[in-house]
Amino acid sequence: VALINNQLLPYPYYAKPGAVRSPAQILQWQVLPNTVPAKSCQAQPTTMARHPHPRLSFMAIPPKKNQDKTDIPTTNTIATVESTITPTTEAIEDTVAALEASSEVTESAPETNTDQVTSTVVE
């Protein structure tokens, strides 16, 4: 008695070798006595248990390994950004109101100082 255990079968089968049996009994299969057959097999006679055939929609077919591939060249689409240092000259005016520290009330024009400041701006 040989045990047939296939991943497609809902439960394992025992098969008796055909050399021991008569030609009329060679094609007979016996179900394990301690298992419950699947519902699709219960309506069939117990002398002949058939293998359930999975539908093609459940079968996975792997793709061919030697498929024609179009090689797409890889290009670097990210441009390198170089920083440019641009000197910028800004005029900063400092307005200081000059107040005279005298007891007299006088009006004086505010003094304006202009300084040149150079800064670097990275663009």
Swiss-Prot record:
Mammary gland specific. Secreted in milk. Coiled coil: none annotated. Its main location: secreted. It is found in: Secreted. The keyword Transport does not apply. GO terms for cellular component: extracellular space. Glycans are attached at T74, T84, T86, T89, T95, S102, T118. InterPro entries: Casein_kappa. Keywords: Glycoprotein, Milk protein, Phosphoprotein, Secreted. Residues 100-123 are annotated as: Disordered. Residues 103-123 have a biased composition (Polar residues). Pfam families: Casein_kappa (PF00997). The modification Phosphoserine is found at S102, S119. Belongs to the kappa-casein family. PANTHER family: KAPPA CASEIN, KAPPA-CASEIN. This is Kappa-casein. It comes from Capreolus capreolus.
